[in-house]
Amino acid sequence: MSKQIIIDPVTRIEGHSKITIKLDDMGAVQDARFHVTQFRGFEKFCEGRPFSEMPSLTGRTCGICPVSHLMASAKACDEILAVEIPETAVKLRSIMNLAQIIQSHALSFFHLSSPDLLFGMDGDPASRHILGVVEKYPTLAVDGVMLRKIGQEIIELLGGKRIHPAWVVPGGVSSPLTPEDREIILNKLPEAKAICERTLSWFKGVIDQFKDEVNTFGNFPSLFMSLVSPSKDGKLAKLEHYDGTLRFMDADGKIVVDGVNSNRYMDYIDEAVEPDTYLKSPYFKQLGYPDGIYRVGPLARLNLIDLCGTPKADQELSEFHALSSGPNLSSFQQHYARLIEMLYGVERIEELLNEPDILDKRVRAFAKPNRSEGVGVSEAPRGTLMHHYKIDDNGLITWVNMIIATGHNNLAMNRSVKQVAQHYVKASHLQEGMLNRVEAVIRTFDPCLSCSTHAMGQMPLLVQLLGPCGELLDEVKRG
């Protein structure tokens, strides 16, 4: 009779989840599953609301990445209005979205994942957390706080507040950038750039200590998907977080699908529902479920592009691409990809702020609804974010579908958990470090479970190993 190991809750992620590891009669890992245990139902209670409220309403899906939902939602509403928003509004939205990328990636890398990198996967859990980092590695801890602070301050300067700004609206943004705020933001960027470069240098110096994790943390063939935009000559694919078209690549580096407009996402993506989790499982239609596994997020975005489009980030991207002959398949390298994206974000914000029309006061297009349906797609920190709305003749929402980055990654996270569990978990004697690795592979995806169910720190943990008759064979307690 099989046995089970249950990790409940998974720590240092956003939201509530657990991991179940099934063992066979010989004590070997047979299967492992990632379960999202919270339910929120945002799609359903949006019904009946005016579509113009959707950016602010869906922004409440998450307190960590509200800007991401603002962007995708506003783009869906732009489609319903059938307007082309002013170019300055596009640039201002892009700046806020990049600031969101910076602050969220900083939270993921410095606060949630750096304890594993600094203290090791087998480190004492009593100190393997952000407070332990503050005590032993104060410079890195301060860098993380400052980088996230800068990202949040840029959001506040543009939108009026750091959490749930109401500045991104259907048709553009509600107010232009002032010369004073432009200068304030520009003055913050040199420090942010220095932190990004310093942290990248440190990470590249320690990555060889984690060769085993690189080889076993979600390292398997899959598709990758993200938005991309063309380079100026149209021959290369460039890093994109706000606009662009969808691209799919296979594990050999072959472009499977390219140039997909946002409103055609349903031609390629479908969603499966499983009984043991509130998180849906999107898959690539042509391969079916569950074979149509694909990944989104920082790793996917860097795999799918030829260049970032900014000087220092392009140098780092060249080094990143040199790590493998094709796409990088290891989810552990999501950490590396986040650092490159933060550097790109800082450089790109500086470029946009120096555009001659960035202070233009024409930042919003007004119209009544001209379509009954709209789709908005953008790149959130964790990956591709999709909002799809339908309205009635009164402009009220009748149907909503939100496919969140963590949802896109659900099949990949489950496969990653199984791979790590099979490599590290030994039923004869449970060790905290074994189980931390199972959690740590989930942290490489930086899942946002509030978002993904349309729903930190060191949390209590009890892991029990039960025998065939339910007898307690071993347990690990934390907290």
What would you call each of these model-derived segments?
Residues 1-384, 394, 404-479:
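Active-site bordering "gate/hinge" segments
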Residues 390-391:
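Aromatic-rich beta-strand edge motifs centered on tyrosine
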